Amino acid sequence: MATVSMRDMLQAGVHFGHQTRYWNPKMKPFIFGARNKVHIINLEKTVPMFNEALAELTKISSRKGKILFVGTKRAASEAVKEAANNCDQFFVNHRWLGGMLTNWKTVRQSIKRLKDLEIQSQDGTFDKLTKKEALMRTRELNKLENSLGGIKDMGGLPDALFVVDADHEHIAIKEANNLGIPVFSIVDTNSDPDGVDFIIPGNDDAIRAVKLYLGAVATAVREGRSQDLAVQAEESFVEAE
């Protein structure tokens, strides 16, 4: 079972919050104290909360649930893409377009356009166009790939969101709340935990911390998927008898 220890968290700097003057009072229950005007997060709270979140994510993926990783700030962007790809899930790592979940119908049309352009770029269609037209389509393709590439094969709304920074991704969280999609999120001392179903109090800026969370989540999701495959194999074996 995917778990993260106190030692792992200390080494990654999960306990370092933001400067005390930027705090959100709603995070008070998760703060241990302050050192040099920086809030220290209580890892005695974080460790069990994160491990509970991991267990739930394993459960969701064992039921073929789709997990959408969200982290659009530069520090997290590459790690988010990597983690999602590692467990065959989906991601948004550049910009959250308003309505990405709540206006899925429109997003689906944009994904169709992206896939059409991908085919055109590979089947020689671009070569038959004028230089200017080909350039415009290439730009459109790159722009769509940037914003929708991580969800183009999702095929519908996700079953859960894993968010790296609750403050930065508040629009994504609000959309998930409106649709009843559970939200798992890293919540730093400057963030509002409201709207997050599984709160993970922790540093959301240090790349080592971000990679620790994402690596553990990817492992939890993979475990869930292998449980699902094991059940499928068992069922087909029983049918074959």
Swiss-Prot record:
It holds the Pfam family Ribosomal_S2. GO terms for cellular component: cytosolic small ribosomal subunit. Transmembrane segments: none annotated. Belongs to the universal ribosomal protein uS2 family. This is Small ribosomal subunit protein uS2. Keywords: Ribonucleoprotein, Ribosomal protein. The keyword Acetylation does not apply.
